[in-house]
């Protein structure tokens, strides 16, 4: 199952709101192993593999090939409420892994068109779908006892037994709105983090969320360019509630939670690390998004975290704009206001108050044979998103890049080759140069799905006032 994406696999993609902006992917291989993905298409295809649904799949290999079956309950999906007849975008595909990767589909894709969902066939019907309350209750009981041995040899000294009772609630209020709640959540059965090497890293490592309460409906909180809600900063919640949904062109999300072990990311332009507040905090996050035109979006997000003598509040506006079927603009403006606690002031040398802004733009063109991009970021020195992930602040950055691909016949030894190159330059807010980077690589694809890549990176970097030249080459 871990290599399902590299297998011969049948894929069903459904755009249940027919908004041509997001959808659900369901993958099944010949042995019936399954995978599911929540995808978005507001700026090209983007996949979120952390999404999980409960559904059934089966597969059988026969003399002519193989057959797969999928049984997806409606409660695993979200779709419009109060409509007599629904229209869903859909595509059925097969990744046919042979000497060359073929993708077979019920419809053809124009690779000069950046969006994929807008090219899907439409399925009309579902007039008899009844909205169920769809209540899921998951009680938990956790017991813990620590025994100690004071002398060797000797007997164990039995410790006290600590018992905690918890409850998770998932309530489908309607077909397009879900309420989640949790009391003393038990995350002991959640899969562990992937091993990350944190040696010689100046900026904090990003870890993916794995906890079910935070994963359900997580896509409703996502903004265009900044990660304003990084739920891994909420380490030990005892109470939490969340409402997510979509009605017509309007999507909304609201989350409230407390935290007994609050972690805060403290960034600079030279590095970042987490600070523990050692006190209980309350957290809130909300987002509203409106689907603008055929493909675009505009949204407003806010997060707030507070304790007795501390608060951090962030307000942001963002969106995507499609000039045509291949050219898009992403933008985001954000403002943060912080009052630091005495603990943070004394232990991390912070001022009593911090307030600043952040801006970002990204312009891209995606065509079949080439792509271009330009980006700009301006992050203030005192900009902090204590519920989000902003590992670097106090900088201004510009970047340009692009690439081109040449396609050859599928029977040739070399089926395609491409190049990509980019340049970016970063300054501190006081004007000092932080980094200038040039990067380029060549990629060759051939038979047996073989890939050969060669690349070079030149980086001129300022670290604590000292400049370093880095020249990196790689072959893959």
Give each language-model segment a name.
Residues 135, 177-179, 249-254, 294-299, ...:
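Repeated loop/turn-to-beta-strand initiation elements of outer-membrane beta-barrel proteins
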Residues 30, 74, 94-96, 143-147, ...:
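Transmembrane beta-strands of outer-membrane beta-barrel pores
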Residues 1-284, 289, 309:
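Structural preference for beta-rich elements and adjacent junctions enriched in aromatics
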Residues 236, 335-476:
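Exposed, low-structure sequence patches enriched in small/polar residues
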Residues 68, 137, 167, 241, ...:
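Membrane-embedded beta-strands of outer-membrane beta-barrel proteins
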Residues 39-41, 103-105, 149-154, 193-196, ...:
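Outer-membrane beta-barrel translocator domains and adjoining extracellular loop/strand segments
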Residues 72, 171, 245-247, 289-292, ...:
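Residue-level signature of outer-membrane beta-barrel architecture
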């Amino acid at each position: 199952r871990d290599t399902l994406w590299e297998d011969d696999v049948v894929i069903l993609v459904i755009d249940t709101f027919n908004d041509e902006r997001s959808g659900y992917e369901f993958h099944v291989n010949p042995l019936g192993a399954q995978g599911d993905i929540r995808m978005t298409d507001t700026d090209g295809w983007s996949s979120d593999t952390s999404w999980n649904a409960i559904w059934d799949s089966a597969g059988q290999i026969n003399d002519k090939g193989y057959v797969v079956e999928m049984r997806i309950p409606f409660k695993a999906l979200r779709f419009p409420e109060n409509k007599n007849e629904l229209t869903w975008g859909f595509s059925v595909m097969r990744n046919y892994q042979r000497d060359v990767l073929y993708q077979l589909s019920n419809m053809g894709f124009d690779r000069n068109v950046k969006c994929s969902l807008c090219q899907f066939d439409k399925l009309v019907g579902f007039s008899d779908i009844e909205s169920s309350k769809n209540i899921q209750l998951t009680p938990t009981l956790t017991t813990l006892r620590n025994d100690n041995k004071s002398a060797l040899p000797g007997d164990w000294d039995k410790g006290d037994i600590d018992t905690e009772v918890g409850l998770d609630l998932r309530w489908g209020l309607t077909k397009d709105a879900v309420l989640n709640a949790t009391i003393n959540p038990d995350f002991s059965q959640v899969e562990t983090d992937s091993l990350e090497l944190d040696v010689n890293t100046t900026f904090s490592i990003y870890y993916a969320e794995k906890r079910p309460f935070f994963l359900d409906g997580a896509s409703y909180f996502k903004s265009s360019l900044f990660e304003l809600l990084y739920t891994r900063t909420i380490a030990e919640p005892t109470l939490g509630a969340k409402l997510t949904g979509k009605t017509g062109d309007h999507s909304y999300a609201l989350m409230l939670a407390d935290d007994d072990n609050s972690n805060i990311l403290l960034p600079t332009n030279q590095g970042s690390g987490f600070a523990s507040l050692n006190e209980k905090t309350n957290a809130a996050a909300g987002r509203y998004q409106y689907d603008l035109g055929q493909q675009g979006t505009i949204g407003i997000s806010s997060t707030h975290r507070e304790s007795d003598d501390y608060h951090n509040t962030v307000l942001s506006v963002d969106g995507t704009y499609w000039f045509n079927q291949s050219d898009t603009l992403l933008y985001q403006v954000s403002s943060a206001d912080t009052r630091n606690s005495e603990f943070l002031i004394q232990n991390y040398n912070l001022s009593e108050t911090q307030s600043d802004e952040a801006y970002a733009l990204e312009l891209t063109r995606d065509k079949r044979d080439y792509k271009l991009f330009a980006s700009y970021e301006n992050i203030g020195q005192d900009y902090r998103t204590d519920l989000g992930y902003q590992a670097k602040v106090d900088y201004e950055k510009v970047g340009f890049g692009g690439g081109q691909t040449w396609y050859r016949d599928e029977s040739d030894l070399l089926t395609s080759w491409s190049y990509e190159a980019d340049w970016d330059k970063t300054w501190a807010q006081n004007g000092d140069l932080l980094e200038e980077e040039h990067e380029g690589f060549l990629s060759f694809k051939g038979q047996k799905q073989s890939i050969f890549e060669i690349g070079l990176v030149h980086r001129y970097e300022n670290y604590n006032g000292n400049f370093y030249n880095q020249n990196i080459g790689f072959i893959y």
